[in-house]
């Protein structure tokens, strides 16, 4: 993953920590399947229905995870999203 121009390595512990921060905050959304997509791709295709997340925002998990990790100085400055 790139942040600015810096490459960041993400491992399972990062994913587990993010899941812990999101526990009880993010809705559990379903994973959907499509036989048509499977046939066209020649593989099993899974769709995570994040559009069913709070506020219909598919980026809720990432945004929330980033905001709760803000330092006190970053919290005073705030965040802008569009």
Label the predicted regions.
Residues 2-82:
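PLP-dependent amino-acid enzyme catalytic core
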């Amino acid at each position: 993953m790139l942040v600015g121009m810096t490459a960041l390595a993400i491992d399972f512990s990062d994913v587990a920590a993010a899941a812990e921060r999101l526990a009880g905050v993010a809705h559990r959304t379903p994973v959907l399947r499509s036989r048509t997509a499977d046939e066209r791709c020649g593989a099993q295709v899974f769709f995570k229905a994040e559009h069913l997340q709070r506020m219909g925002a598919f980026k809720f998990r990432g945004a929330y995870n980033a905001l709760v990790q803000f330092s006190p100085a970053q919290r005073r400055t705030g965040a802008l999203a569009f």
